[in-house]
């Protein structure tokens, strides 16, 4: 049986990590009863990690990603949905 080796660019891997972190943080904030969108926007706009709960290590996960990269990943995802 032949197996194919798959190659992924560092951008693809980075984006997958960002998406995973955003999903985990979103779910954790929702579990705690917060409005995840408002909390994430507050963090992205101000850079103040106090907007993100430490529940399930969410704060540490999100601050491990540059805010600029978060915005880029969100914008790219949005534009992909609209096939722009």
Language model region names:
Residues 2-84:
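Intrinsically disordered, low-complexity, basic-enriched segments
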